[in-house]
């Protein structure tokens, strides 16, 4: 029983002495007092019945009747009800990594099918079984390109999602990688490991890029591939994609997931889990994690990544979404999202609101006199009108969830503006 008891004072003192500290406080002195958690201001205990009443009372404060035209990386997409029913089964709802293939065939098969679907969507040879999100996918893609090219400089478009850029700065700073940000791809790219672009970019614009003399990384929202060419057809060597739009609720920002996909020759530099299909000793089909020498099973500093495994649950959500929607349903959702965006843009133009994009999918930038007043007017009518970019520009997005009536409400509200 001794092994399960908390440390006594003598043990704590011995541990502190062994690392050269005088007290527990010394362990946390680098953390400013202002950043430390104080005493929790909790209410008095309640019975289960009273607690249910209290939670319902709090829930009434939620605003659930807003219509959303907000995008910027997270979108209000249709989520089939069956997804949560399957994904929340105890067999799947776990952070466990399926190392014991003999007891995890279901999980491994889902991972394998997910990877297959991602390869079909991106046109690439191989895809991993998720990373955290699109931002980490971009950052990991840069690290991957640097390992492949053995060059320490990369080119990154300024028109990437700003949050992606922040994550990239963190990863590259920590790894001593030099990043140059561009508006237009330079003529000479041979001295760089890779060029990273987002298609469509953060502002919704679909831009064609010329061929480069280094590795090409294309970042995208996976739902855009319901209509656009695959990244492979665009000339990508590595694809970094966010997959929140494959059946994942917005969830106040997460959890979501991203993926990395690449050409087969770069497979051993691909971070994250990889599920493979083989046959067992009896000749039956079997699934297992494969090519694991890329991961933390080897020396940490030589591993391609130390990504955790629980994002595979979000990969399951994406697999279920694509299975339920089917190819036709997936394409229809994409077409409807794009149709709604272009319909809204056209109706706004008739009211004198200019769209700044030339080519876009479901997201575009509009020019207004006063962005704050513009968005506040919409919000007063229970419409979340978009993301303020600056005093005169607003980023607007639509999905298949926006009805024609909601688009008319958006435009009608501005007629009063």
Regions found by a protein language model. Give the residues of each.
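Compact, charge-rich alpha-helical regulatory domains located at protein termini
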Residues: 1-37
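Active-site C-terminal subdomain of aminotransferase-like
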Residues: 246-351, 356-358
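Gly-rich Lys/Arg/Thr-decorated short loops/hinges at beta-loop-alpha junctions or inter-strand turns
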Residues: 90-101, 119-124, 149-150, 170-174, ...
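N-terminal entrance/gating region of PLP-dependent enzymes' catalytic architecture
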Residues: 35-112, 298
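Short loop-beta-helix segment that forms the pyridoxal 5′-phosphate
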Residues: 100-103, 119-139
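Noncatalytic alpha-helical scaffolds and linker/capping helices
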Residues: 401-402, 410
């Amino acid at each position: 029983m001794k092994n399960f008891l908390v440390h006594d004072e003598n043990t704590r003192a011995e541990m502190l002495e062994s690392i050269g500290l005088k007290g527990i406080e010394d362990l946390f002195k680098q953390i400013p007092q202002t950043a430390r958690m104080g005493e929790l201001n909790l209410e008095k205990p309640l019975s289960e019945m009273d607690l249910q009443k209290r939670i319902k009372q709090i829930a009434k404060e939620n605003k659930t009747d807003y219509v959303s035209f907000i995008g910027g990386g997270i979108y209000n997409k249709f989520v089939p009800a069956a997804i949560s029913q399957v994904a929340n089964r105890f067999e799947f709802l776990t952070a466990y990594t399926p190392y014991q293939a003999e007891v995890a065939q279901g999980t491994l098969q889902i991972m394998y099918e997910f990877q297959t679907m991602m390869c079909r969507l991106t046109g690439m040879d191989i895809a991993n079984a998720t990373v955290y999100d699109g931002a980490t996918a971009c950052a990991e893609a840069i690290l991957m390109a640097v390992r492949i090219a053995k060059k320490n400089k990369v080119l990154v478009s300024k028109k990437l999602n700003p949050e992606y850029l922040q994550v990239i700065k963190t990863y590259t700073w920590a790894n001593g990688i030099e990043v140059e940000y561009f508006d237009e791809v330079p003529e000479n790219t041979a001295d760089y490991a890779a060029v990273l672009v987002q298609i469509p970019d953060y502002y919704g614009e679909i831009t064609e890029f010329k061929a480069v003399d280094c590795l090409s990384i294309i970042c995208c929202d996976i739902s855009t591939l319901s209509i656009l060419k695959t990244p492979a057809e665009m000339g990508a060597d590595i694809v970094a994609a966010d997959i929140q739009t494959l059946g994942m609720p917005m969830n106040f920002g997460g959890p979501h997931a991203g993926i990395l996909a690449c050409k087969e020759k770069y497979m051993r530099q691909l971070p994250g889990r990889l599920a493979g299909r083989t046959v067992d000793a009896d000749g039956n089909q079997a699934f297992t994690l494969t090519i694991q020498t890329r991961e933390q099973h080897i020396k940490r500093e030589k591993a391609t990544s130390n990504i955790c495994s629980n994002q595979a649950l979000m990969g399951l959500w994406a697999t279920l979404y694509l299975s339920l929607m089917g190819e036709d349903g997936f394409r229809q959702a994409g077409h409807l999202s794009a149709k709604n965006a272009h319909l809204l843009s056209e109706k706004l133009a008739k009211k004198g609101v200019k769209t700044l994009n030339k080519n876009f999918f479901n997201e575009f930038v509009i020019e207004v006199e006063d962005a704050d007043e513009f968005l506040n007017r919409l919000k007063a009518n229970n419409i979340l009108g978009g993301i303020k970019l600056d005093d005169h520009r607003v980023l607007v997005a639509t999905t298949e969830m926006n009805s024609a009536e909601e688009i008319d409400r958006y435009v009608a509200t501005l007629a009063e503006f």
